[in-house]
């Protein structure tokens, strides 16, 4: 038993700590979590863009120091570029078809996740550059570090890590509601992009592309941003 604890501390404690620290830096300064004193949240609200960028830079430095981006430049190899293109096109088509089926089978009042409503409210009260930065840079990079890079490091079996990653990403965004099945195909596609060779650059590119298509090309693919 003692040896197992020592082994856990030696191999799994660091990625668990990285995951928790990144979650706090990414989401911890939002008021509904109540982690920090009210005065901090007042400051964060008044200087939202500054706090957002500052915490993101800390996330990037921590990730870089812990080799999260060691395969990042491999993304420019022809084989990997073709893979990303395939996943962007094929993945988005799969998601659109899955969501079409979802909306056919789900009661109207249950179809739209609260997270999507929160995002719509967020768009209305923040400048264009701020929510664009969140949607296409900060959000995808931070969430891929949390749900793919660090979460995968906690498991010795890659297939188990894939299952947990897919489930956790969808659940955190929706809870166990009907809309869980709205986010599930998105989570599956992005996780599989990472799963192939555990390269975070590819899942970030796919994550950002899904947000981009969903935000600016709603008539092409009808699914909700994550």
UniProtKB/Swiss-Prot annotation:
List cystine links.
none
Q: Name one GO molecular function term.
A: endopeptidase activity
Annotated membrane topology: Multi-pass membrane protein
**Regions that span the bilayer:** 16-36, 43-63, 81-101, 169-189, 206-226
Which sequence ranges form a coiled-coil region, renumbered to this chain? none
Q: Which coarse location class describes where this protein primarily resides?
A: membrane
Subcellular compartments: Cell membrane
Keywords, alphabetical: Cell membrane, Membrane, Transmembrane, Transmembrane helix
* Pfam families tied to this protein: Rce1-like
Superkingdom of this protein's organism: Bacteria
- Which InterPro entries does this one have? Rce1/LyrA-like_dom
Hey, which family's this protein in? Belongs to the UPF0177 family.
Q: What is this protein called?
A: UPF0177 protein YbdJ
State the encoding gene. Answer: ybdJ
């Amino acid at each position: 038993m003692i040896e197992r604890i020592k082994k856990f501390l030696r191999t799994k404690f660091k990625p668990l700590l990285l995951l928790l620290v990144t979650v706090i830096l990414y989401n911890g300064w939002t008021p509904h979590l109540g982690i920090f004193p009210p005065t901090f949240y007042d400051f964060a609200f008044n200087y939202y863009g500054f706090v957002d960028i500052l915490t993101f830079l800390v996330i990037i430095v921590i990730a870089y120091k812990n080799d999260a981006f060691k395969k990042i430049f491999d993304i420019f190899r022809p084989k990997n570029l073709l893979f990303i293109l395939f996943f962007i096109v094929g993945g988005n088509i799969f998601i659109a078809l899955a969501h079409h089926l979802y909306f056919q089978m789900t009661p109207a009042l249950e179809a739209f996740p609260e997270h999507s409503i929160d995002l719509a409210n967020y768009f209305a009260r923040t400048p264009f550059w701020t929510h664009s930065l969140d949607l296409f840079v900060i959000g995808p990079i931070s969430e891929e570090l949390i749900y793919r890079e660090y979460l995968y490091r906690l498991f010795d079996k890659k297939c188990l890590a894939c299952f947990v990653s897919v489930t956790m990403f969808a659940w955190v965004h929706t809870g166990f509601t009907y809309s869980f099945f709205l986010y599930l195909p998105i989570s599956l596609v992005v996780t599989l992009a990472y799963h192939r060779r555990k390269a975070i650059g590819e899942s970030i590119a796919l994550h950002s592309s899904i947000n981009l298509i969903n935000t600016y090309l709603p008539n092409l693919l009808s699914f909700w941003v994550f």
